[in-house]
Design a protein with these regions (language model features):
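Acidic beta-strand-to-loop metal/phosphate-binding motif
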Residues: 135-144
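Active-site and ligand/interface coordination hotspots across diverse enzymes
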Residues: 1-73
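Conserved small/polar residues in nucleotide/adenosyl-binding loops
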Residues: 173-175
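Charged, often glycine-rich, active-site loop that binds/positions anionic groups
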Residues: 100-121
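Charged helix-capping and loop-helix junction motifs
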Residues: 74-77, 119, 150-155
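Short, well-structured hydrophobic secondary-structure segments
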Residues: 56-59, 64-101
């Protein structure tokens, strides 16, 4: 279980580009040719966790929990299985808000605008990893209601995805 130690404004957060550059370097704990994990170590936040491929399913949850490469939690195990079942060669887990918290009730009450901006850079980057039309699965359910700011975060994602021509899915329904 992960309970945030403090609000993200009080911790050092790597800018997305810096975290991505670090994630491209060899890691002792996992194979970077197989995994994309940004940042590449366990932190109070996470931008991206997934497997590498040319036809990924981008899975979007609310916020990251405890998963790491080769140590997926049940949510990411399901995302990986659903991606494979639906013909994708990989999955990329992204979250509406990047703060780690096993329980959404533990998420910060007020969003960190800087962290959100960096998270949107991560989302835009994910869309470029897809050969062809990016497929984005809105996999968050009713938990989105836990914090009022989450819907504004999703609106930003929709704008970014629209510029890339992404197709959104809700469960097995095309939206």
């Amino acid at each position: 279980m992960h309970i945030p130690k403090q609000d993200t404004a009080g911790i050092d957060v790597l800018p997305f580009e810096e975290a991505l550059a670090a994630a491209q370097r060899p890691q002792a704990d996992y194979d970077v040719s197989r995994w994309l994990y940004v940042p590449p170590t366990y932190e109070e936040y996470r931008y991206i966790l997934g497997t590498r491929g040319v036809h990924p399913l981008i899975c979007v949850g609310i916020n990251p929990s405890t998963a790491e490469p080769d140590r997926l939690d049940p949510t990411l195990q399901s995302a990986q299985r659903i991606a494979r079942f639906n013909g994708y060669d990989s999955f990329l887990m992204f979250n509406v808000y990047a703060q780690r918290a096993t329980r959404p009730d533990d998420m910060e009450k007020t969003p960190n605008a800087w962290l959100h901006g960096e998270n949107m850079k991560a989302f835009a980057y994910l869309l470029t990893l897809c050969r062809g039309t990016p497929a984005v699965w809105a996999a968050w359910g009713s938990i989105i209601e836990k914090r009022a700011y989450l819907s504004a975060c999703v609106a930003d994602m929709l704008e970014i995805a629209g510029r890339q021509g992404a197709v959104w899915y809700l469960s097995l329904i095309h939206i």
